[in-house]
Amino acid sequence: MFNLGIITISDKASRGQRADRSGPLIKESLAGQDCRVVGYEVIPDEAALIAERLKHWADSGDMDIILTTGGTGLAPRDVTPEATLSIIDKEVPGLPEMMRTSSFSATPNAMLSRAVAGVRKGCLIVNLPGSPKAVAECLEVIMPVLAHAVDVIKGRVTEHPAPGG
């Protein structure tokens, strides 16, 4: 069982001008998984605020994983990757690489994603896209490895058996 936080990053949703559909979709998609959502926020596309929330949640020790949604594209206010990179201790490039690779079969626009993933103080942070459809696709890709990632980060797994045995 791992604890999860969800941060939706959207100017319009944070001002109440649009409903957040991606954050609730993440919650729904994880129902029945071996995790518990312990935090959920909607904040604007402000790099300093994003970095502060990520630091606060990761440093609290209450969350094993933080999933962000939104702010990973090319628009001028899309700053989630920069905010994430500014606070992580190490990158985990395989997660966003596989999300982009998998999503590319649905849309070539996946190449434009700048999502990143990394670890800060024992907490895995993963940027997801903002579109509900893209969120669902990316969650399907990363869900099978999240529990193992948490176990490795927490030091509960020290040896990895060779494939096939």
Tell me what each language-model feature is.
Residues 1-165:
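Non-catalytic beta/alpha edge segments that cap or flank active sites
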